[in-house]
């Protein structure tokens, strides 16, 4: 004996209807958590049998169930997409039809695990079709792609995809995914026609015409481009030139052909190799019959246009790649080896006969394989047509099942109201989030000429992007919060234009003097060098004070241990204002030796590693006058000193610009004197002398070559040696040209 009533779940959902032995039985309504999501229909001992399930997004399923999953036959509405057909344990299949209500794009055939698999027919928004084999939601195996007339073909404007291939996937709630990132025609233009991939010219000619007057490659590259030119120039056909019949097998692009492509930049030529064929008749159609791999024309196949243009041979990623033969409308042929639509080997003069015969044999084998593949593809297309008709029959049965499910849902609502009159139903018996009106199916491509801009055919499920079609259990789907996005690292604090410096003193244990240096910072801030912290025992790290103060330099962050960590280099590259100039001075004084001096030397080398440094030499102040030599930069140097190796400034090599230009050497001025007066102390009985390091920091310049300092007499030798460099360059270029010509004529 069955009874019924209302049961409220802890998560906010409820069931109202009949039950038996503590399980839902008969007709009833079950809502999900917080009243979102609903199943209305018939039940059998706790499981759904026939009814309507509505997701919180508004997507619906109307049909049969088994063991809590969609199983049998039914109709799913997901956005503008509607699937009608069979279901197996929650997945689409085995036979079914999926179509877009907006533009008529659809797939009819076999399914497996929710993806197109087996044989089927895909119809695109412009009316073009594909019949053949499918694997994992992609065209793979053998098939036939038939386009509509060129004037009616969909215009694809998306820069990401350049043909209407198989229909792509979408989210579970019916919202559109981004288009497939992999282009169907790699390197083809942003504007093309659906189903048209065969071009009547070689892409190398596009390069030549676009690069006229903008030759930016070397002579060897120019020879390579000329070598790979094809005789199938569209401009040659348009002007009725007969150059493609020449012995060399190369066409001559006329001035009119250059004018056709004169508006296209060189960058576009190299990046996209755009196909421009304005003379294609609006009634021209194109058919490809052959092999497919990963949703693209790959393998052996035959592509033919209704105007007589035909290619038989090997393909790779929708391009002629391998050996093949091209037949033109006037009956002439071009055969050889192609690489990404470019003819790289064919009938040319001065070729060794044995080599030419080998190419001919490979071309013949490729043509035969393409013809065999075309025959198999036609057979597979016939099988796909039979699967399509069977799928349509299942779709009709699904419509009938959907109508029965709606009737069961109506009875379930009446039953629920009888058991619990207070049971409220909102929004057709459901409290859910009404989805926003979708204006697109799945595609951002648009379309046919002669009609306003409209959405192109959305694409069906694809491998790797197909959402889960699993049927929820007794309760509807729950929405899970997405994890927060990773917080980007804070940008380094910009250097203050008004620099503040503090003076720090250490001991030079080698010379027995103090070393003073100016450090950037404010009064009271922690020092940036870690050697001072080691003296304090390392109890206080620089990170705690400096990070809060925001005074860390962009290039380094120091730890209490004295080791440096590289910062983010990108802000330093974008910085436009030059950093302040640091000047470090050193005085020889009588003081005690300490290990702090050696640590300071290491720190100074680390701080100088990211800067280009101009280091002026030591100056010794003697009682008698000295001879001075003036360099080109205007800096004064003493010649009477016997410099020691360590006087070069803590192991940092002096660097000079080879060009000795004004950017590297700033002449001394009144505002910035080259020599500063510093108090000196006597060390025992030694003569008074002054040692000074003047370090000028500037950001590294990428374009300026750096070389060791040279004297004026060495400059004359450099001028004489550099005069022969252009001669050597010219000789090397001429030698390379000769080798290339020999290679082209005798070895290819």
Curated annotation (Swiss-Prot):
Keywords: Cell membrane, Endoplasmic reticulum, Membrane, Phosphoprotein, Repeat, Transmembrane, Transmembrane helix
InterPro entries noted in UniProt: Junctophilin (IPR017191), MORN (IPR003409)
Annotated stretches, region: Disordered: 230-259, 416-496, 526-597, 624-649
Ranges annotated as biased composition (Basic and acidic residues): 639-649
Pfam family, one: MORN
GO biological process terms held by the UniProt record: calcium ion transport into cytosol; exploration behavior; learning; locomotion; memory; neuromuscular process controlling balance; regulation of cardiac muscle contraction by calcium ion signaling; regulation of neuronal synaptic plasticity
Chain positions of MORN repeats: 15-37, 39-60, 61-82, 83-105, 107-129, 130-152, 288-310, 311-333
Domain comment, as recorded: The MORN (membrane occupation and recognition nexus) repeats contribute to the plasma membrane binding, possibly by interacting with phospholipids.
UniProt similarity note: Belongs to the junctophilin family.
Protein name, UniProt field: Junctophilin-3
Lineage: Eukaryota, Metazoa, Chordata, Craniata, Vertebrata
Record gene name: JPH3
